[in-house]
A protein has these predicted regions:
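Conserved N-terminal entry element of GNAT/NAT acetyltransferase domains
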Residues: 1-21, 192-223
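Active-site/acyl-donor-binding loops of N-acyltransferases
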Residues: 2-7, 46, 65, 129-201, ...
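Short, polar/flexible loop-turn hinges at active-site or ligand-entry regions and domain interfaces
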Residues: 38, 105-109
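Short, well-ordered alpha-helical packing segments
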Residues: 79, 99-102, 116-123, 142-146, ...
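Residue-level recognition of the GNAT/N-acetyltransferase active site
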Residues: 103-106, 302
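Conserved acetyl-CoA-binding loop-helix of GNAT-fold acetyltransferases
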Residues: 108-124, 304-316
Length: 385
């Protein structure tokens, strides 16, 4: 696909998918962003999905490519188009996650139109686009998508402070807000943090004790994941494709960043679902400081089994020594499961955005709380693994 558009200062603008020969130009693009003071806006040099090369069957519809805008000399904007499927009322629909769109226009205004042209071309290529994250309405990317007519819905955020005192003292959210910082400090030194930790732990362990399920680590997704997806899919108005082939592309076997937990009934060994978790030791993170953060990344099963899946993820991460566990789930059943497991609601900056050509989040469609999306969808895990 090669589309030529009028570019900047009279130069022709070509919008196309990146090729192997574009690597040096992409390195220069990233270097210019760093030199312009936007070193956090770095485009990946490896656009394919983690398990794509090894685990993607020929012609399988889940894969990721980079689309670029160049002016004949250099790349001026780039984004990842993560090709995927979503099942809406049981019907499979192709779509793309629009991940990491970045433009040289953020450091040089003469290239400010690059991202607009790139996004318009991406929408022409695949009208049904979605993206996750973005941030608050004050963020430039948020305002940009709204101007393009994208619809959005906030995905609730939940956290479980495994080590409450350390979390109170370590979260940047508290440190950067004087009143909350004082409250956190008082809570830590007064013993209130330990008391809260005891209550949360008791609540969670009681739920775990009453659970009829048990979990075990799996090295890969297999036929059992296909059966879970087929069995549970009718209970969701909309759900991202989550069969074994897809999951092994996204969370590949052998990748130490992800842990796959298969959850089954005790004794009967009947599958009830699965959950993927991840953990990372942060270092001067803008949200988590130096805390070790565990994430409930993804999961699937019948909606009635969501509490067992969330509890399994929390149990595993707590045993691995994380300080705090976080999750974002839009579906109401999964949000309830987080609260039931003892997780606390917090301020969320994690949104589901849908392009004008997509069928979700329309006024005449089903409620957003019937859409199952999680932190592991799109590029939402990039900062947490």
């Amino acid at each position: 696909m090669r589309i030529v558009r009028s570019g900047f200062e009279g130069a022709p603008m070509e919008i196309r998918f990146a090729e192997d020969g574009d690597l040096d130009a992409m390195i220069r693009f990233n270097r210019r962003l760093r030199e312009g003071g936007r070193g956090e806006e770095q485009m990946t040099l490896h656009p394919s999905l983690p398990g794509e090369a090894r685990y993607r069957p020929p012609g399988f519809p889940v894969y990721r490519r980079m689309m670029i805008a160049e002016d004949g000399r250099e790349i001026r904007a780039a984004m990842l188009l993560y090709h995927h499927n979503v099942f809406i009322k049981g019907e499979r629909r192709d779509f793309c996650w629009a991940d990491m769109p970045v433009s040289e226009g953020i450091i040089d205004r003469k290239y400010s139109l690059a991202i607009i042209q790139l996004m318009k071309r991406a929408a022409a290529y695949q009208p049904f686009l979605m993206t996750m994250g973005v941030g608050t309405p004050e963020v430039e990317a948020f305002r940009f998508l709204v101007k393009l007519g994208w619809r959005w819905r906030l995905a609730p955020f939940f956290f479980y402070p495994v080590r409450v005192t350390k979390t109170l003292l370590g979260l940047r959210y508290f440190k950067e807000r004087p009143k909350l910082r004082l409250a956190a400090l008082l809570g830590a030194v007064s013993g209130a943090g330990a008391g809260l930790g005891g209550l949360l732990s008791l609540r969670h362990h009681l739920a775990s004790f009453l659970s009829t399920c048990q979990s075990a680590e799996e090295i890969a997704f297999d036929d059992w994941a296909d059966r879970i997806f087929t069995d549970a899919l009718p209970e969701y108005a909309a759900a991202i494709r989550s069969d074994a082939s897809t999951l092994n592309i996204v969370y590949p076997p052998g990748d130490p960043r992800y842990t796959r937990l298969r959850v089954r009934r005790k004794g009967a060994k009947e599958d009830v679902g699965w959950i993927v978790v991840a953990s990372k030791q942060m270092k001067d993170n803008r949200y988590f400081g130096d805390l070790k953060v565990g994430t409930l990344a993804d999961g699937f099963g019948r909606v009635a089994n969501a509490p067992a899946l969330v509890a399994a993820g929390i149990d595993h991460l707590a045993e691995t020594g994380v300080d705090i566990i976080v999750a974002n789930f839009l579906h109401a059943a999964w949000a309830r499961a987080c609260r039931r497991a003892g997780m606390l609601p917090g301020p969320s900056t994690y949104n589901l955005f849908v392009s004008p050509g997509g069928p979700l989040l329309r006024d005449d469609s089903f409620p957003p709380e019937e859409i199952h999306v999680a932190r592991g969808h799109g590029d939402g895990l990039d900062a947490l693994v």
